Amino acid sequence: RGLGETNIERMKRHLKEKERKIKKKLETYQKGRALVRKGRERRGLKTVSIVGYTNAGKTTLLNKLTGRKEYVANELFATLDTRVGELWLPNKRKSVLLADTIGFIKELPPELLNAFASTLSEAVESDLLIHVTDASDEHLLDHVDVVEDILKSLGIHETPRMLVMNKIDQISDAKKKAIINAFPKKNLVWISASEDLGLEGLIERIEEEIG
């Protein structure tokens, strides 16, 4: 029993240390963000932010749409800062800023949510949110609810947004039909960022929404 308690304490210390390192990274990223944002404002570009549950494919989508080569990993908090690229809108003949944000998780500790809020400043000030989901995940509906709840807690639930179903190359027609039935009032966008499916249609929707 004593050994078990020791292991539990060791695990708690490990998690505490990991949380401390994450907070420190977030503080570092936050310092220069205000100056960078002012520079973007001077250029007069609108901002579109990609939000979603962790591992939904947000960074892959940013890379494909902007030509950036950001780190992609199947792990929590792989994207701690907010990465930003430019997306060219051909029909509008102008660019918008496209920002990738951290992946949300269920029951995010309040102290970490406060720290992450600073990195989500791009999303808070965005003209449009792209809520990316993993259509192949069995917990899809729960993940959508988690993201919506966090957006509400950040006060940005009324920002215009679209719901994008990613990884459609991994789902059956029956699963697609079930998803459509689950979101009867949503004009869903269907893509596979990794396979370059539906990206042109997504850009057209962004053009429509951004005005």
Predicted regions mapped to residue ranges:
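Inter-motif core of Ras-like GTPase G domains
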Residues: 112-137, 153
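Short coil/turn segments at beta-strand junctions that form active-site/ligand-binding loops
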Residues: 93-94, 127, 159, 186
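Structural beta-sheet core signal
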Residues: 131, 163-165
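Conserved ATPase-coupling elements of RecA-like P-loop NTPase cores
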Residues: 107-110, 139-144, 172-177
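Conserved G1/Walker A P-loop phosphate-binding module
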Residues: 1-113, 120-124
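Canonical P-loop GTPase G-domain recognition
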Residues: 159-162, 169-211
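Conserved nucleotide-binding/hydrolysis micro-motifs of P-loop NTPases
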Residues: 102-105, 135-139, 167-172, 194-198
